[in-house]
C-alpha cells in the first residue's frame, strides 16, 4: 500500500488578536525558506490565492503562509453593524467595528503564531493596504513590502473613491445570487469575470474551480465587506514607510485605477513600480512568473539584518 501523499497545506491554525481568531495555513513545500505572508483582499478568503502561484513562490525560496482577514473566511466575523453597503461605509466619519490598526495587528498575530520574528509581506487589493499599515506600525517585523492592486494605505473614507472605478462598483451592486453554496460559487465566478483583464480570454474553468474550493459567502457578504472597508487608519502617512517596497498593479485593473499604484510608488521613499500588462484586479496564471520574480528580486535587495530580527 503506497503512503498517502503529503498535503499541500498545513492544518488550519488559529492566531489570536484579542477576541478575534484568525485562520491561517502554511505551504508544506520549502517550509525552511524565507518567511512570506500573503494578505488577501476585500471579501476574499485565503483560498482565493492560487495554489500554483504559492508553489511558485516556494520554488523561489519562500516559506509561504496565508490567512483570512477578520470578517473573512474561517476567521472571526464581527456582529452586524448599521452600514450594510461597502460604498456607504466610505461615507462614514469613523469605522463602526474596528480600526485599520486592528487589521494590521492581525497580520502580526499570525506571524507570531507561525513563530516568525519577521517576514516578507505580499498584500493584494485590501491586503495591500493592510500590508502597508503593518510596515508602518511594525517596521521591524517586515523584511520587504510588496503591495499589489492596492490604494495608498493612509487613505480611507471618501478619499478612497478617487482611486476606484465607480462603474465597476455599479456592476457589483447589480449582481444577485442565492444565499446558498451554489450561489456563492456563481457569485465568485461573476466577480472573477468582472475583475479580469478584458485583453485576455477569461478562464471560466479556473474561476469556477477556485470558487468551488471555497464556496463561502465572502464575495457577497456586504455587511462584512462594509466593516472591512470602513476600518480607518490613524497612523502616519505612507511617506514614513522605511522597508524596501515594490508596487505592482495591473495595467487593465477594472476596479482600482493604476494611478493608485503610481501614487504609492511616488510617495514611498525608494519604492519601485511595476505595471503588469494584460492583468486586471487578479493574480492570473500568465503573470505568476513575473510577479514571483519581482518579489524575489525585492527580497534579494534586503537580507534580514538585526533590525528585521528584533521584535517591536
Give the residues covered by each predicted segment.
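Conserved HGGG/HGGXW glycine-rich cap/lid loop of the alpha/beta-hydrolase fold
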Residues: 20-90
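Catalytic active-site module of serine/aspartate enzymes centered on a nucleophile-bearing elbow/loop
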Residues: 271-312
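Acidic catalytic loop of the alpha/beta-hydrolase fold
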Residues: 252-256
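Alpha/beta-hydrolase
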Residues: 160-236, 243, 263
